[in-house]
Amino acid sequence: LRWLSWRYGELLRRQRAHLVEVRETCLEGPEALDRLAEHAPEEVAELGERVGEDELEEGARLALVAAIDAAWSAHLGHAAELREGIHLRVLAREDPLTEFEKEMGVAYQGLSGRILDDAVAALLEAPVADGRLDLESLGSRIPSATWAYTVTDNELGDDFTRMGRALRRRLAGRR
């Protein structure tokens, strides 16, 4: 069971490592503001006229980190939902691990755009008073926990196991 859980977790580990790298880069410098300004130039420029550069940079940093964390939590939730029924793919003669990786790969590809959209929205929704952003409202968007789980991808058994069970039930019924 550990080996199987490891196999399913490997894709998520690689995705997490990439997001952690992006997150750390955004925390260390002006990368967060650059990303948001590239994604929504007019909106970020307009906000920049209302608040100072340092304030905008810190707000972009907090908004992007909160969006990354929320998106990752949602991504893990999607993975958990997918894992709940992945064993049923065996009935369609599909490899559950391959199908899991396909679906989670597609989901991850859309994550970057959603993160930027959410971060820009959070930054623009933050209250501005006296040329300052309410940075505390941005920090409250950061999720406080994630979770881990184990899974089996073939709890119904392979074709021969299912046929054997059916045969045993049939023979037991005739005795």
Q: What does each of the following model-derived ranges do?
A:
Residues 1-175:
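Extended, charged helical/alpha-beta scaffold domains that provide interaction surfaces
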